[in-house]
Amino acid sequence: MYAGLVFAGGGNRCYWQGGFYETVAPRLDLKPKRVVGASAGALAMLYTALGLGHYVRERVCEACLGRSSEMDWAGFRQGGRLFPVGDMYHLMLTDLFTRERLATLQAQADFRVAISRPPRFWPLPVAALLGIGAYQLEKRLRKPVHATAGRRLGFKPDLIRLENCAAPDDLIAALMASASVPPFMPAGLVGQRAALDGGLVDNAPAWALADMEAAGEPTLVLLTRPVSAVPQIANRTYVSPSQVIPVSQFTIRNPEGIRFAYELGIRDGEAFLRSLEAKARAV
């Protein structure tokens, strides 16, 4: 039914996408040709395609147990990262993406991971600070579905195609870069060039499906925040959570919020299916 899918970024809110996709995909027999994801949405698009949603959620929720802080001061004093979420994310990616699973994904669809390239000759710490600051400010003031501040600053969009990943390490580097939000997540390096969170250019990179839409092929964009209005673009459908998801993007101590996001995705997926059935009956 949909030839292209977009998984927007959103950190832990992206577990909503897992619940929605797992509910809707079997009923609609979704077999998209191209799937694009940014930040944690890029991970969500891949583990849902592999049918590993339950495993990922349980592993993450288990890792949250017993944690009272987002920071690891003891590890930091010994030379580790202050925010352990980045190392935890990398460890999970290394466990998930074997050579066999990469081959499975490459044979299934044209998956693309969105990253942002900072302006050339900018020191990376400056680029990260300005890019993330501009993104957050625009989000708070304008609440756009598609951000524009990053492009105006000179950030460039880039896509890493899974078919060009020769080994799991290439995919893991792309996923880490797509979620790169210092100091929470480390800066990325892809193709010997610096890379930051794909959401700094556009958190919902539907631009990567524009050629399909222009050719008359329908696409579906999975957002991770409730929105009151979306752009009206031919052949594009947006879906979003029906309420605010009570979990912060990078938290590693809120398993209840992660489960809530997933369960809300299931409910919203069922509501979406009912709306499609109602439209079909009205025709």
Language model features with spans:
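Patatin-like phospholipase
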Residues: 1-38, 46-283
